[in-house]
């Protein structure tokens, strides 16, 4: 059934829809299956996303038609479909009238992902008007709270030097805590890796107690505040709360030094909202493990990493992993800096829409995946600032002189970039950074040709066979 006469209105202007403030706008890259027309398929897509089905039903009235989602722009050559969803379509809490990401996804990314006439459809951007945006929690705290704990300025406080304890699984409580202590002697921030929780060989209660003690010892030894991000992910909201309460109680006087990590993609929006609302005074660390199943450029269904991170800010994440923008080991490219801008700025341009956040707190980019001291200056130059949390596992524990030197090398790389000093020049005066070149010679050869001569390091590579 061709539903284009009802669910398509190409006379609508995007600027008028935005000015009206009554529609959520979504941009999809969509392709119909062979034998289906583009506009007719887009209309069916909008119908399935809102008030329609595959046949006309007798219960439809004029009010129902008034809240139809409408296709307002198509560009078949670019496979672009834009749809306007009336704000009234989206579900609200009965307890407080707030909006929910679950409803947003159910409409904009629900049944339309399995339609028989659609080859693929992926959301690349969305726009929320102020009236709807204001119904989301947004972040309660962000990196400024961590800077305050660290004794830094709460604006432009710079890089938080962090790591992930490796191996990600297999360490028992005592060696895990000792690894934390070792890194904290040179760095700021440690996070649980996403699978670490309450394994039989590493009970959470035992591990957290030892980590809290390791933090106290490191702070006493260095005279500096330290930070820890504890994984409280669970299926059951009551388990999330129980874990969070135990962690904060155990850290005691250092509770403000603790972030609470939730695997937001695998555990879902309810887990993020539970943590955001139950623990509003603590940094909510949104880990996105699993997101690549839908966000990868190789996937033509789902939504992009940009959309995922934008939703995280609405939900209230204090920070979310954003990848390394092509400078680390994970999938990404330099243009991904637009994700960081959308998370941190009060108004930012996306792939299709310019979004105003109306004063909603910023969400902090968290950088991880193959980063080390040698890769960082290029990353900062691409982004234009260093107001991020870095969690470098191999970049710290893979340093030739150990994790303390690894942490210091990361900090020195940031300081070199901040001060506008070429990395090799800075390394001549800072041994940990200099030794990072020997720790990661493959990266050094690629990024800094001639580094051995500059640093006076003997070239021990075997000559290639003739």
UniProtKB/Swiss-Prot annotation:
Which chain positions carry the site (Transition state stabilizer)?
A: 329
| Pfam families in alphabetical order | RuBisCO_large (PF00016), RuBisCO_large_N (PF02788)
Q: Which pairs are disulfide-linked?
A: none
Active-site residues per Swiss-Prot or TrEMBL entry: 166, 287
Q: Which residues bind Mg(2+)?
A: 191, 193-194
The UniProt annotation places substrate binding at 111, 168, 288, 321, 368
Family note: Belongs to the RuBisCO large chain family. Type II subfamily.
Q: What else is known?
A: The basic functional RuBisCO is composed of a large chain homodimer in a 'head-to-tail' conformation. In contrast to form I RuBisCO, the form II RuBisCO are composed solely of large subunits.
Q: What is this protein called?
A: Ribulose bisphosphate carboxylase
Say which species the protein is native to.
Rhodospirillum rubrum (strain ATCC 11170 / ATH 1.1.1 / DSM 467 / LMG 4362 / NCIMB 8255 / S1)
Source species taxonomy: Bacteria, Pseudomonadati, Pseudomonadota, Alphaproteobacteria, Rhodospirillales
Quote the gene name from the UniProt entry: cbbM
